[in-house]
């Protein structure tokens, strides 16, 4: 199944991505090869092969909940550029003023 360059551009546009013409051509070629390989699975004869939903025997294995000591705060803060009141200080990413 051939993936067209137009389809690549359409999906890129929906994803807010921009590609050069060369990149678009390369993506179309690569995606076509991937889809062709996946379509080969349709040719596999699975008649008589039992359905398998899970091959692991240890379904829902839960470990014991054990409390352990955490990290030493002073040791952790050695690599932190800025901290305040025992918390790591990071740059603001949301402007508190104006409309969102």
Swiss-Prot record:
One Gene Ontology biological process: glutaminyl-tRNAGln biosynthesis via transamidation
Cystines in this chain: none
UniProt xrefs under InterPro entries: Asp/Glu-ADT_sf_sub_c, GatC
Keyword presence, Nucleotide-binding: yes
Protein EC: 6.3.5.-
Keyword entries, A-Z: ATP-binding, Ligase, Nucleotide-binding, Protein biosynthesis
A GO MF term: asparaginyl-tRNA synthase (glutamine-hydrolyzing) activity
SUPFAM superfamilies given in the database record: Glu-tRNAGln amidotransferase C subunit (SSF141000)
Catalytic activity reported: L-glutamyl-tRNA(Gln) + L-glutamine + ATP + H2O = L-glutaminyl-tRNA(Gln) + L-glutamate + ADP + phosphate + H(+); L-aspartyl-tRNA(Asn) + L-glutamine + ATP + H2O = L-asparaginyl-tRNA(Asn) + L-glutamate + ADP + phosphate + 2 H(+)
Organism domain of life: Bacteria
Quaternary structure and interacting proteins, as annotated: Heterotrimer of A, B and C subunits.
Family assignment from sequence similarity: Belongs to the GatC family.
Job description of the protein: Allows the formation of correctly charged Asn-tRNA(Asn) or Gln-tRNA(Gln) through the transamidation of misacylated Asp-tRNA(Asn) or Glu-tRNA(Gln) in organisms which lack either or both of asparaginyl-tRNA or glutaminyl-tRNA synthetases. The reaction takes place in the presence of glutamine and ATP through an activated phospho-Asp-tRNA(Asn) or phospho-Glu-tRNA(Gln).
Official protein name in the record: Aspartyl/glutamyl-tRNA(Asn/Gln) amidotransferase subunit C
Organism: Streptococcus mutans serotype c (strain ATCC 700610 / UA159)
Phylogenetic classification of the source organism: Bacteria, Bacillati, Bacillota, Bacilli, Lactobacillales
């Amino acid at each position: 199944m051939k993936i067209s360059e137009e389809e690549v551009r359409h999906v890129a546009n929906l994803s807010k991505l921009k590609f050069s013409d060369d990149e678009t051509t390369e993506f179309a070629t690569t995606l076509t090869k991937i889809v062709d390989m996946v379509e080969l699975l349709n040719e596999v004869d699975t008649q008589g092969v039992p359905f398998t939903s899970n091959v692991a025997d240890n379904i829902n294995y839960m470990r014991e909940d054990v409390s352990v000591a955490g990290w030493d705060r002073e040791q952790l803060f050695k690599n932190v550029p800025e901290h305040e009141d025992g918390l790591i200080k990071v740059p603001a990413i949301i402007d508190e003023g104006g409309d969102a």
